[in-house]
Structure formats: C-alpha cells, structure tokens
C-alpha cells in the first residue's frame, strides 16, 4: 500500500474543490518541519542539554523551561522568512512578532504554544506544540503594519489548526476545516505519513480528564457532573467512568481524539477574577476547532469556545471539550444553575 505524505495530502486538498490556498499549504509544511526539529530536540533530552528551567519567566508569569525557549525560537526562525505570514504570536512572548522588513509578507497570521505541557519535560511525559492560522486583514496587503488587534478574531475564523504530540511516536494532527487527519513522523525517512484519516470523537464516553485535586474550587455544575461520573452504574449517568489526567493538554486531547472522552479545565474559585487557566488564542481555539471538526464539542461552560470574541492576546478561558453528548450535558448543568433561584 502506497503511503501518502503530508505534502501529497495538502497538494490534493489544494487541487480539490476545497481550494486550500497555496500560501496556507506552504505555511503548514513549514510549521510541520519546525515540529520535526522540536521533536528531535525533545527526544535528545538530557543528552542534548535541553532539560531544566531558566531564570526567566514568560508573559504568563511561568518559569520558562529551556525547551520552551528553544521551541519558540525554532518556530519563529522557520516561519519568518517564507513570505506566507504577516506576523506571529506566541504564548511565550508578550507582544506579537512582526515579520522583519528584509522578508516578504504574506496574508496570514500564525499563533502557537511552542511547547504545551512543558512542566512534564523533565519527567519524560508526552508534550506537544499547538498552532492556529488566521487571515491577516486586507489592509496588510497594502504594506500597513500588523497590530495586536488584528489577531483578536474569534476561533470560528481560523483557517487551519493543529498540534504535534511528542510521545512514543511523534504525530501531527491537522484540520483545514474539512475534517481531521493525523500524520506520524517516519524518523528514518524524515517525512510525515498519513496514518489516521477522518479522525472522529465518539459522541459518548466513559472517560473524563480533570485535575481532581482542585474539586473543592470548582463551580457547582462541574462538581455535579464529576460527582455523577464517580457514582458509576448506580448514579444518574448509569455507567462506570475512568479518570485520566496527564497534565499536558496535547496528550489529554490526543487521547480523546483517538478513543473519546471529555477534557475539563474549568473556572477555579482560587482566582475568581480569571475566566480560566488555559489561553484562548494559543490552546483553546485551535483545540476546539480540531475537536469540532472531529464531531465533538467545546465550550467554556456556557458558550461555544469558537464564538468567543477575544479582547486581549493572552486571554484565558475555561475549557470543556470532547465527546459531544458529555460536553452538552455539562453545558446544560451550567444553564440550569444560572436559572436556579438565588
């Protein structure tokens, strides 16, 4: 059986009625090459001198790992010269990264979390890269400078989204708005090979992923749902659930993409002024597009995540995504709680 590479898949999409633009095709290929370089650095671990933390913090106030910084640099350097982008934004940087004047500018914006789950680097747990592609405003074609406001588009306007997961195998999961496909890195040949066509998330599940140690801080609708999961066959849901929690969004979502489940990183009463912990633009939006394209659902509790209009680049949000029926159940519990008398 002849194997289909990422390049072949993208060329086929470009030639089809879906009319994937050539700039998007080339952009995705560049991002995929950068992910190969990151995968190589991750796999070397201590042998490559990339483990451990730096003394610096990122814009989120989190201590940066060496691989965080290296991965960010790899993505910036790989993408700034190709002529596909007008600008980039990274979870690791406070402001946007403009394309240097010495390079041509393109019609798209790239956002990424260069190394999601980096707290797991030193303990050798699966981590990954998440990315999102948006259209740049038309005025950019007239050589006008891109600004942060240009990135503040709802997730429904994403052109493409994907993630690479660095585990026992390195995989790239991608959507261009026509379903979800998965590619596995052939390390000997150095190519991405299509191994998962038409990836789908089952509508029902018996698995949930959440950090149970924070249960006392959750909103009542989330506690209600988890209590019902824990009640098993004798409870209102009528089935036994298993809990899975890797503390790496890429790894947790990838498991859901391959076998179903619900991932929850809800609002937390310890920081009531924050809508959530995960970043809307770098994590929630791309993952929500992937999940929805695979037949799942993604909400913040009350709203579809892809409908949220961002008001700042590093905006945070509560995230509940995965198997459609389970996500909708949690949404109903939030709606019922909002309608209940005080």
From Swiss-Prot:
Its cofactor is Mg(2+). It is found in: Cytoplasm. One of its GO terms (molecular function) is magnesium ion binding. It catalyses: beta-D-fructose 1,6-bisphosphate + H2O = beta-D-fructose 6-phosphate + phosphate. It comes from the Bacteria. Its EC number is 3.1.3.11. Keywords: Carbohydrate metabolism, Cytoplasm, Hydrolase, Magnesium, Metal-binding. One of its GO terms (cellular component) is cytosol. Its main location: cytoplasm. Mg(2+) 2 binds at residues 113, 116, 283. Pfam families: FBPase (PF00316), FBPase_C (PF18913). Binds 2 magnesium ions per subunit. Pathway: Carbohydrate biosynthesis; gluconeogenesis. Substrate binds at residues 116-119, 211, 277. It is an enzyme of class 3 (hydrolase). Homotetramer. Belongs to the FBPase class 1 family. This is Fructose-1,6-bisphosphatase class 1. The gene is fbp.
């Amino acid at each position: 059986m002849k194997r289909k590479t990422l390049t072949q898949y993208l060329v086929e999409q470009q030639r089809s009625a879906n009319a994937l633009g050539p700039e998007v095709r080339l952009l995705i290929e560049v991002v995929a090459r950068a992910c190969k370089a990151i995968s190589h650095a991750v796999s070397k671990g201590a042998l490559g001198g990339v483990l451990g933390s730096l003394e610096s913090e990122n814009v989120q106030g989190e201590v940066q790992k060496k691989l965080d910084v290296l991965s960010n640099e790899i993505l910036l350097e790989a993408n700034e010269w190709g002529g596909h982008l007008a600008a980039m934004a990274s979870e690791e940087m406070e402001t946007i990264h403009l394309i240097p004047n010495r390079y041509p500018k393109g019609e798209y914006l790239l956002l990424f979390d260069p190394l999601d789950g980096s707290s797991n680097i030193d303990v050798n747990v699966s981590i990954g890269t998440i990315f999102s592609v948006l259209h740049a405003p038309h005025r950019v074609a007239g050589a006008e400078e891109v600004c942060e406001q240009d990135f503040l588009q709802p997730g429904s306007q994403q052109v493409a989204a994907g993630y690479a997961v660095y585990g026992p195998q390195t995989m790239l999961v991608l959507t261009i708005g026509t379903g979800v496909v998965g590619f596995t890195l052939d390390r000997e040949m150095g190519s991405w090979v299509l191994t998962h066509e038409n990836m789908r998330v089952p509508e029902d599940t018996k698995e949930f992923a959440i950090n149970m140690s924070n249960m006392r801080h959750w909103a009542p609708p989330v506690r209600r749902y988890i209590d019902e999961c824990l009640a098993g066959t004798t409870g209102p849901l009528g089935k036994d659930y298993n809990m899975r929690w890797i503390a790496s969004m890429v790894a947790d979502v990838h498991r859901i993409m391959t076998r179903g489940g619900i991932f929850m990183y809800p609002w937390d009463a310890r920081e009531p002024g924050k809508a959530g912990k995960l970043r809307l633009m770098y994590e929630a939006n791309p993952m929500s597009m992937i999940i929805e394209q695979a037949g799942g659902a993604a909400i913040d509790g009350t709203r579809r995540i892809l409908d949220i209009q961002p008001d700042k680049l590093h905006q945070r949000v509560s995230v509940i995504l995965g198997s459609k029926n389970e996500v909708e159940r949690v949404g109903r519990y939030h709606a019922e709680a909002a309608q209940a008398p005080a």
